[in-house]
Amino acid sequence: MSDPRYQIDVSVVTRYLKDQSDPESDRFAFAYTITVQNNGSIKAKLMSRHWLITNGDGEVEEVRGAGVIGQQPTIEPGQSHTYSSGAVISTRVGTMQGSYQMFAEDGKRFEADIAPFRLAVPGALH
């Protein structure tokens, strides 16, 4: 969305969870920490999420749900909300991308895009 009043920026840090993974069973677990920053001028509530999780074979899993980790945080202008969650994929490398559906204090609904980010076992990429 180009209206600067509704500017939500999303940053992601990922980590491979070796102790929760089982490569011989094609199970690769990852944790991710996401910061949702309200750089707009209007308070906004994160209502729901939409994820596309793609493994290294191109298989896509679509996930939709209310809020994030059981919460629907309201984020004031200049403030952020950080949370951690996880994903399990069947290949050593994959990607996630998606969006948050937001509801602004003025009644406007808008989407905050989550740019693609990589899930990768250390050393899996050269």
UniProtKB/Swiss-Prot annotation:
One of its GO terms (biological process) is error-free translesion synthesis. Disulfide bonds: none annotated. PROSITE patterns: APAG (PS51087). It holds the Pfam family DUF525. It comes from Pseudomonas putida (strain W619). PANTHER family: F-BOX ONLY PROTEIN 3 (PTHR14289), POLYMERASE DELTA-INTERACTING PROTEIN 2 (PTHR14289:SF16). SUPFAM superfamilies: ApaG-like (SSF110069). NCBIfam families: PRK05461.1. Gene3D superfamilies: ApaG domain (2.60.40.1470). Residues 2-126 form the ApaG domain. It comes from the Bacteria. This is Protein ApaG. InterPro entries: ApaG_domain, ApaG_sf, Uncharacterised_ApaG. Coiled coil: none annotated.
